[in-house]
Amino acid sequence: MEISIPSPADFHVHLRQGTLSELVTPHVRQGGFQLAYIMPNLKPPVTTTEQALAYKESLQKIDPNVEYLMTLYLSPSLTPEEIHKAAKAGIVGVKSYPRGVTTNSDGGIESYETYYPIFEAMQENDMVLNLHGEIPSDAEKNIHIINAEPSFLPHLLKLHKAFPKLRIVLEHATTRAAVEAVKSCGPTVACTITAHHLFLTVDDWAGQSFNYCKPVAKFPDDREALRAVIKEGIYDLFGAIHIDVKPLPGHPRFFLGSDSAPHPSHTKSTSTPDQGCAAGVYTSPVLLPLVAHVLESYGALGRLEDFVSTFGRKFYKRELAVETSAKKVTLKQVPEGFKIQESYDIASGENVVPFWAGKDIRWKIVEER
């Protein structure tokens, strides 16, 4: 069995910098993807148009065959004037990180009201606001990594109400509450879902650092909500599979954003009392086969093209032109299993361990045409 997908697009990926970037940037294409939406949390973060364009140029030098969509890091230095400049230069979005919540987020935000002039400028220029949907842990308020995402959702709803024409993406949702919140919003609010959050629950990362990411995977019921919103429309009202008719339309505001986040393996596998392991799961090298594998596992393979291409491209206004739609990536089912590589070597002498290293999946890429 083979499946061909037109121009898969990953709407949330970390391609890092230096020798690590040299390793992981080609993995976007290796994993089956032709468009990548690039996160700006470098050291220092990407806060100006010039920095974003320079970063894009560095990625293009590594692999010119991918379309890179660039973003800015929301910070106090950002101005409405810079937003107008960025939009004119083709920068697509601005990423918001709550302070200290995830990798390289020390310069993140503490109050959204401060940035309302920025959001107004973004709305005027039809840019996208990408939200890391968690609030920092606070023992006095009983906020922790499990409820950080649900606790953030009132901010999402408030922003949507204040800026109804601003396109907003709640990134890497992990909870049923997040799914329901996005569903309750209008057509300008969307949500990315990662491949690994379709696999994992809390039991999979507690004690296993290579599955640890931010936001953390939650409970089985939350995972079911993520899976269900992707599968939506495949089953009729009586629970029977539509075999002889085309599936009903799925939910167009939920699509893939891998949040593929590589870290040298020693930062994932070791920690000290004053330094925890790095948060991030690396899926880029096998992303499309991995998504096919997990969707097939719960009867949602028919949603693959919508999830990895159609829905995200439509929301980001990157629909395929007629001539582009011919560029397809073909997956082949491998009943005996296709083993995921154990690790990838960085030129610095370190290595990166991918998600599900050494395990078998049922799909592999056979060609691109």
Where does each model-flagged region fall?
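Short helix-capping segments at alpha-helix termini
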Residues: Q60-V66, K161-F163, G186-P187, A300
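Divalent metal-dependent hydrolysis catalytic cores, especially in the metallo-beta-lactamase
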Residues: D10-H14, L23-E50, D63-S75, I91-N104, ...
